[in-house]
Amino acid sequence: MSSKKVIKTSNAPDPVGPYNQAIKAGDFIYCSGQIAIDPALNEITCLGDIEKETIQVLKNLAEVLKAGGAKIEDVIKTTIYLTDLRNFQIVNKIYSDFFNIENTPARACVEVSSLPKGVLVEIDCVAFLD
């Protein structure tokens, strides 16, 4: 029987709704969507700048993964939510710099009408610990 554990760290922003930063279930870590909130300030300092937002989102995800005992190389699936698919190539560039190209996870990218706090990008992920 697998166990379920809440993952929480002060090195990533608190959730903006009634959910946890991540849940570890067995050998998997399910990270909730991260937006570009700077955890040190608990605010968005780069609103409207897709490059800076994406970098902050990926940093936040890395911190949540670390709190769960995982690293970015353990990510097996991501979902990217964009308010404008014209930002797709910019996000791809930053994303490819962040993930090892030989070990990039499976991924979906979808356009949505809006995201919390008016951000341009949100990313969630699933990691596998072996």
Regions of interest found by a model, annotated:
Residues 2-130:
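Short, polar/acidic, helix-capping and beta-turn segments at strand->helix junctions
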